[in-house]
Amino acid sequence: MPIEQKGRTFASQKLKGKSALRYEIAVTILTGEIAWINGPFQAGEYSDLRIFREGGLQHAIDLGERVEADDGYRGDPTTFRVPYEVLTRQNEEADNMQKRVQGRHETINARLKKFAILRERYRHDITQHGYVFRAVAVLVQISVKNGDPLYDVDYKVNF
């Protein structure tokens, strides 16, 4: 989410050094509902893994529960299931299932970005950005529940 702030702590690698904010969004695997939103965080200062550990989601999940995640969370295999680096026949099915789950999460992200206020430069207080982000997330969730559903994912918990 581009913002008006300047400096290294806001610089986003994804946006080639432009200032931005990060949010942590968790989507339930079985229903596709947005279950957790945390942020805003300064893009250059907080990695995905740091946001997870310091932002509260780590303490909100059940002990022993594993989270489907992308490569930004590599390094904690007891908590995260990230894509396999080397595919074998045994883990190919699990990897394909995970890609479908991540694709559905990316669909939520794309729907959030359809709102210009999250796509364009933001020039107001960062706290207000958090309010706006959450309001947009509620609108996206309402749309998922009432006529624009996500595609189904057949998820097996045998990894």
What are these regions, as identified by a protein language model?
Residues 1-159:
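Short, well-ordered secondary-structure "scaffold" segments embedded in the functional core
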